[in-house]
């Protein structure tokens, strides 16, 4: 086993984060950055790309986008 410290940039602020049990919010540097990211997903500012947003809908499902 090596003693190399693996670190990654925080997706929000780019601060280097040690990838270990010492960093409970990894890959984020802190709870604040973690919550900012969650808020971006909740506000649909971030999304997983796909061909069409209604690919899973069929005739029996209600169109939730109209609400």
From Swiss-Prot:
Zn(2+) binds at residues 10, 13, 29, 33. The keyword Metal-binding applies. It comes from the Bacteria. Pfam families: YacG. Keywords: Metal-binding, Zinc. Belongs to the DNA gyrase inhibitor YacG family. This is DNA gyrase inhibitor YacG. The gene is yacG.
């Amino acid at each position: 086993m090596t003693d190399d410290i693996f670190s990654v940039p925080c997706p929000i602020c780019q601060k280097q984060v040690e990838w270990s049990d010492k960093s409970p919010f990894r890959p984020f540097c802190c709870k604040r950055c973690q919550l900012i990211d969650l808020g971006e997903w909740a506000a649909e500012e971030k999304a997983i790309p796909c061909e069409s947003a209604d690919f899973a809908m069929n005739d029996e499902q209600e169109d939730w986008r109209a609400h």
